[in-house]
C-alpha cells in the first residue's frame, strides 16, 4: 500500500476522527505489529497541534497468556499505578485513539467464565473514573490490518495479499479517496440530515419486522435523539468516534422492548463466533436466547451484569451500505455493525439525550438510558427488514422498507 495513501488515512484519524486540538495530549493504543502506521498517526497528531503523544502498546498473545496463567484475583486487581493513570486521564482529558488489528481468534481457548469474572471484578473500580470522563473528551476507533485478521477475512490468499486486500477494504469503507476530509464532511452532513428528520417525528417506539422471524417493538426515551457521524464533547469539540460509520443511532428506553429478534450476521465475541441466534425480550429484558453455535456463550454475555440483558442502542444502517456492498465479513464489530441495522446489549449512550451536558448521570439513568459494563452490537439487518415508527402524536411512519431508508 502506498505510503501517501496511508498518511492520508493517518491524517483522517487525527483530524476528522479524533479531531486533535492544539495543545491537547493524545494517547494511542495499538498492537505491537503496527509500529509504522502508529508512527504515521502520531506524526499526524503532532501536525494537528498535539502537545504530547503517548503510545500504549498491546500484544494479544501476552494478554492471552496472562489470562490463562494468572489467578482471577490477580487479574481483577487494579494496581495503584493503574488508578493513578486513570486519575491522570480524568484530570487531563487526553484524546484517545484506538487502532484495532487483533486476530479475531486470538483469545480462542481462554475460559469465557474467567474473562467474565475478571471484567466484573475490575469494572467496579474503573467505572467511577469512566463516569467522570463521560462526554468530556474525543476518541476514535479505527483499524489497521493485522496478518492473522487478514487471513481470517481472506483465508485463500497469501499473507501479503490478504493484508493488501484488507487494507483496500478498510480504506474504501473509510472513504480514503482523493479528498477524504471533504468526503467525510459530506457524509457527516448526510447522516445529520437523516437524524434531523427522524428527530422531527417524535418517535415513541420502533417496530421491526423481517421474514426471518424478527418481530420486535422497542420503546424510545422522549428526551432522546438520533445521532450519527460526528458528535460533540461537553466542551464543544466535534469528532468522529468511529471510522468507518454508516449509522443513525439512539439509546432506547430501558424496560421497553417486546418480542423476538433474529441475527443476520455472526457475532464475534471473545475469540469465538456466535452464529444464527435469536433473543426474545419481555418488559425490556432478554429472557430467552438461542444460537446454532455457542449458545452458552451468548447466554453468558446476556448474564454479564444487571444491565447486559437490556438494550443500549438501536442503530439504523441501510442494507446497501458501502460496507455491506463489499460482501466481506470482517469479523470485527467496527465494520460489521456498519453493514446493516443492529442492536446492542448493555450500556446506552448518554450523549443521545438532549441537553445532556446539563443533566446529571443519575438523571439520565432515570430517563431510561441503560448502564452496563458491556456494549455488544449484533446485526439484524436483512434485505426485507421493515422498521415502522409509532409517533407520540399517533402517526405511523415508515422508516425502513426492503432493508433501506424509506425517506
Residue ranges and their predicted role:
Residues 11, 199-201, 270-272, 307, ...:
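Short solvent-exposed loop/turn micro-motifs enriched in small/polar/acidic residues
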Residues 1-258, 389, 395-398, 405-407:
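Active-site bordering "gate/hinge" segments
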Residues 256-258, 274-276, 283, 309-313, ...:
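Active-site lining segments that contact anionic ligands and/or coordinate catalytic metals
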Residues 286-357:
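Dual-mode signal for accessory low-complexity, basic/Gly-rich regions
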Residues 14-16, 194-195, 204-206, 248-251, ...:
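Generic recognition of flexible, low-complexity loop/linker segments
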Residues 250-306:
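Long, well-ordered mid-to-C-terminal structural blocks that present hydrophobic/aromatic surfaces
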Residues 362-407:
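Extended hydrophobic packing segments that form well-structured cores
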Amino acid at each position: 500500500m502506498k505510503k501517501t495513501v496511508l498518511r492520508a488515512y493517518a491524517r483522517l484519524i487525527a483530524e476528522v476522527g479524533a479531531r486533535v486540538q492544539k495543545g491537547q495530549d493524545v494517547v494511542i493504543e495499538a498492537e505491537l505489529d503496527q509500529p509504522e502506521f502508529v508512527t504515521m498517526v502520531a506524526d499526524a497528531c503532532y501536525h494537528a497541534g498535539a502537545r504530547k503523544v503517548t503510545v500504549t502498546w498491546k500484544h494479544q498473545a501476552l494478554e492471552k497468556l496472562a489470562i490463562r496463567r494468572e489467578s482471577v484475583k490477580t487479574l481483577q486487581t487494579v494496581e495503584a499505578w493503574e488508578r493513578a493513570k486513570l486519575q491522570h486521564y480524568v484530570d487531563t482529558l487526553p484524546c484517545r485513539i484506538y487502532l484495532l488489528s487483533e486476530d479475531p481468534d486470538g483469545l480462542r481457548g481462554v475460559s469465557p467464565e474467567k474473562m467474565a469474572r475478571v471484567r466484573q471484578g475490575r469494572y467496579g473500580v474503573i467505572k467511577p473514573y469512566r463516569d467522570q470522563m463521560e462526554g468530556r473528551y474525543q476518541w476514535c476507533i479505527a483499524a489497521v490490518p493485522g496478518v492473522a485478521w487478514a487471513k481470517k477475512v481472506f483465508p485463500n490468499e497469501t499473507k501479503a495479499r490478504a493484508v493488501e486486500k484488507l487494507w483496500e477494504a478498510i480504506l474504501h469503507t473509510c472513504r480514503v479517496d482523493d479528498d477524504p476530509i471533504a468526503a467525510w464532511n459530506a457524509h457527516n452532513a448526510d447522516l445529520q440530515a437523516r437524524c434531523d428528520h427522524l428527530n422531527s417525528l417524535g418517535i415513541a417506539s420502533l417496530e421491526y419486522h423481517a421474514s426471518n422471524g424478527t418481530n420486535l417493538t422497542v420503546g424510545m426515551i422522549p428526551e432522546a435523539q438520533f445521532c450519527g457521524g460526528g458528535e460533540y464533547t461537553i466542551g464543544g469539540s466535534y469528532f468522529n468516534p468511529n471510522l468507518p460509520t454508516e449509522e443513525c443511532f439512539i439509546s432506547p428506553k430501558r424496560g421497553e422492548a417486546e418480542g423476538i429478534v433474529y441475527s443476520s450476521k455472526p457475532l464475534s465475541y471473545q475469540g469465538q463466533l456466535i452464529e444464527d441466534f435469536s433473543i426474545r425480550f419481555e418488559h425490556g429484558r432478554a429472557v430467552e436466547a438461542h444460537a446454532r453455535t455457542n449458545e452458552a456463550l451468548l447466554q453468558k454475555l446476556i448474564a454479564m451484569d444487571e444491565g447486559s440483558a437490556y438494550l443500549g442502542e438501536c442503530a439504523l444502517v441501510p442494507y446497501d451500505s458501502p460496507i455491506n456492498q463489499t460482501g466481506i465479513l470482517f469479523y470485527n464489530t467496527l465494520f460489521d455493525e456498519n453493514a446493516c441495522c443492529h442492536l446492542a446489549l448493555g450500556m446506552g449512550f448518554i450523549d443521545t439525550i438532549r441537553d445532556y451536558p446539563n443533566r446529571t448521570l443519575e438523571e439520565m439513568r432515570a430517563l431510561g438510558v441503560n448502564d452496563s459494563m458491556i456494549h455488544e452490537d449484533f446485526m439484524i439487518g436483512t434485505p426485507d427488514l421493515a422498521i415502522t415508527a409509532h409517533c407520540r402524536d399517533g402517526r405511523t411512519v415508515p422508516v425502513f422498507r426492503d432493508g433501506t431508508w424509506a425517506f
